């Protein structure tokens, strides 16, 4: 019986070893399955985070590009404002000087008919020189006269007081200038008051 017992005991040990091996193998498979599931979940989370980071980078680049564009727009507008300020800083002052020009021209027209001697002529010549110098100085700063007889009527720089037929002047052209107009750097300071040939 001893040999049978030993044999049975050996078989029992073999079965037990086989059962343990099978249990270990089952445990390893069970352990591998959760690890694979966790690994798949981790990869999915990594992909999700990479997508989020890429989207955040794109948003940041977009915000940065918009900010740079806005800065360029602000600079351009500031440069334009400065340029306009330089061009038109004299506008109010120039408008006030137009009255002086008008008065000088009226005085010259009145003196032309009143000249009787050399002293008076010297006075007229002096006023004419002053007038020319004054007009020249205004021109240096971009102030120019508009409204000349025979010039085509332009409603942007001329103000028509009336229409009348005029010999030798085409229709819609200036026949009489009642008051000269002036521009500053191309911008109207005062429109010319004119009569237009009809």
UniProtKB/Swiss-Prot annotation:
Coiled coil: none annotated. It comes from the Bacteria. The keyword Iron-sulfur does not apply. PROSITE patterns: GRPE. GO terms for molecular function: adenyl-nucleotide exchange factor activity; protein homodimerization activity; protein-folding chaperone binding; unfolded protein binding. Keywords: Chaperone, Cytoplasm, Stress response. GO terms for biological process: protein folding. GO terms for cellular component: cytosol. It is found in: Cytoplasm. Signal peptide: none annotated. InterPro entries: GrpE (IPR000740), GrpE_coiled_coil (IPR013805), GrpE_head (IPR009012). The keyword Chaperone applies. Homodimer. Participates actively in the response to hyperosmotic and heat shock by preventing the aggregation of stress-denatured proteins, in association with DnaK and GrpE. It is the nucleotide exchange factor for DnaK and may function as a thermosensor. Unfolded proteins bind initially to DnaJ; upon interaction with the DnaJ-bound protein, DnaK hydrolyzes its bound ATP, resulting in the formation of a stable complex. GrpE releases ADP from DnaK; ATP binding to DnaK triggers the release of the substrate protein, thus completing the reaction cycle. Belongs to the GrpE family. PANTHER family: GRPE PROTEIN, GRPE PROTEIN HOMOLOG, MITOCHONDRIAL. This is Protein GrpE.
């Amino acid at each position: 019986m001893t040999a049978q017992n030993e044999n049975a005991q050996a078989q029992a040990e073999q079965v037990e070893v086989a059962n343990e091996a099978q249990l270990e193998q089952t445990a390893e498979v069970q352990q591998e399955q959760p690890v694979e599931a966790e690994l798949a979940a981790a990869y999915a989370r990594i992909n999700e985070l990479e997508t989020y980071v890429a989207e955040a980078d794109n948003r940041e680049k977009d915000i940065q590009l918009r900010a740079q564009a806005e800065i360029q727009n602000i600079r351009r507008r500031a440069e334009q404002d400065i340029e306009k300020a330089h061009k038109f800083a004299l506008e109010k002052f120039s408008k006030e000087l137009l009255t002086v020009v008008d008065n000088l021209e009226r005085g010259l027209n009145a003196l032309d008919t009143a000249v009787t001697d050399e002293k008076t002529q010297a006075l007229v010549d002096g006023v004419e020189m002053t007038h020319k110098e004054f007009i020249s100085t205004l021109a240096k700063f971009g102030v120019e006269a508009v409204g000349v007889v025979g010039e085509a009527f332009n409603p942007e720089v001329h103000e028509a007081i009336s229409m009348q037929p005029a010999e030798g002047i085409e229709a819609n052209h200036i026949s009489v200038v009642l008051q000269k107009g002036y521009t500053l750097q191309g911008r109207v300071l005062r429109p010319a008051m004119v009569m237009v040939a009809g």
